[in-house]
From Swiss-Prot:
Record's compositionally biased regions (Basic and acidic residues): 205-217
Top-level taxonomy: Eukaryota, Metazoa, Chordata, Craniata, Vertebrata
Record-given protein name: Protein canopy 4
Location in the cell: Secreted
Intrachain S-S bonds: C27-C185, C30-C173, C83-C145
UniProt record similarity statement: Belongs to the canopy family.
Length: 217
């Protein structure tokens, strides 16, 4: 029984770790912002829709037609409420660095929920029905995401219209937002339970930099 109590205390300490000391940093925010924005754009990248621009004048001049997948409308729709998607992330306290932010329930929380289902009384300081609500860390991720996007919206637009040959993370984070800041988190890639940084060869994308799939985070 004593060992079981110690185990529970350890699990609680992972969940209730001092969140003020582990709020997301600029690199982590930038990384997740680009992951979500790229994912939103990828979902509409193959659209064959055509967008008509301008008004039909009395002169009979026709409205200009452009492809949706290269239009400003596509970018605007992708960016709309993009930071709301950050609220889908959970804190995986058992993972290192930026990998602690991922979608899906963490191993720690799964363990605690299984204990509850077995009739074990678990106290986390919040009602059970609120366990899946966004944490302080995730709420801060969203807030910083909104601020970052507002301050660097022109950089996103520049990439979209002129530099899509470069990866979004590389152009937005490395070359601009984090140009004079720590970029270590950009090299972190989830490799199963190990949570190790991928090697340079394994993590390279088409532009020579690591790519991230929103579904993997």
């Amino acid at each position: 029984m004593e060992m079981f109590t110690v185990f529970l205390f350890y699990m609680f300490s992972l969940v209730l770790a001092n969140q003020e000391e582990r709020l997301p940093n600029k690199c982590e925010v930038c990384k997740l912002l680009t992951v979500e924005l790229q994912d939103a754009l990828d979902k509409t990248g193959r659209s064959k829709e055509v967008v008509e621009l301008g008004e039909v004048l009395d002169t009979g001049k026709r409205r200009r037609k452009i492809k949706y997948n290269t239009s400003e409308m596509r970018l605007t729709e992708a960016m709309d409420n993009i930071c709301e998607r950050i609220l889908q992330y959970k804190v995986h306290a058992e993972r290192p660095g930026s990998l602690r932010y991922a979608k899906g329930t963490s191993q720690t929380m799964n363990t605690l929920k299984n204990l509850v289902e077995k009739g074990v009384k678990v106290e986390l300081g919040v009602p059970y029905e609120l366990w899946d609500e966004p944490t302080v860390e995730v709420a801060e991720l969203k807030r910083q995401c909104e601020t970052m996007l507002e301050e660097h919206e022109e950089v996103v637009e520049d990439w979209y219209f002129h530099h899509q040959d470069k990866g979004l993370e590389r152009f937005f984070c490395e070359a601009h937002v984090l140009k004079d800041s720590d970029q270590e988190c950009l090299t972190e890639i989830w490799k199963g339970d190990m949570g190790m940084k991928g090697s340079e060869e394994e993590s390279e994308g088409k532009d020579g930099k690591e790519t991230h799939d929103a579904g993997e985070l």
